[in-house]
Amino acid sequence: DVKVLQAIAYALNKEEFCQFAFISEDYAEPADSLFTPDTLYYAKPDNTYDNDPAKAQQLLSEAGKTSLSLNLMYISTDKTMESEALYVQSALANVGITVNLVPTDESTFKNKTKDPECTDYDLVLSFYTLGEEPSLYADMCSSDSRSNYSRIKDTDLDALWEKGNSTADETERSDIYKEIQNTINDNMYIYTIAYSNGFYAVNKDFGGFDECLLKTIYYDYSKIYTLEK
């Protein structure tokens, strides 16, 4: 029920969430879209679901779901996920939703999330690194994808992904990907938590790291050079 998903979003506070899970804004900032800000055609969705527990309770009442119990699965060895799970459990309890934590080893986690028949979880914590090309994000949200952990079934959204990938006009592509981001957000298919920052240790004997494009996926090591002493 979309109202239940929206209620969950309103029950959470992203700033508080990030502080609880990542300790400091130096390590992560609240996310507002499936796309990261450096992804092509990133656009902040129209509805940001600002924290509103009263609105969350209203939506749950409208959906007839005032006494929910949900299973939240996450990787047991990931300390950030563990902190996130505890925050979700606490925040949703404030609006009357019981969250049962399901810590799982990484191998089992991968098997269960990729099994479309698995019913062991209602909510799942995950992370992704997909780079600047927006079409890559379709793998997380397409009806038939094995990486569709949220079990999204939306033929209109599937069509938008296909259209965005086959359209050459830049303006039209931008409009399509904005619609995709709004569709995911409006239906609260995926609640994006944070854009985490990457940190790198470098040797002072070398230079060129600024030109190396220090991103999680893309590097150009040819830009790195030895500094003369």
Regions found by a protein language model. Give the residues of each.
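Ligand/substrate-recognition segments at binding pockets and active sites
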Residues: S61-L130
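Extracytoplasmic/peripheral linker and loop segments enriched in polar/acidic and small residues
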Residues: K3-Q6, C18, N100-F109, Y137-K204, ...
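Structural transition elements
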Residues: Y10, D26-E62, D78-M81
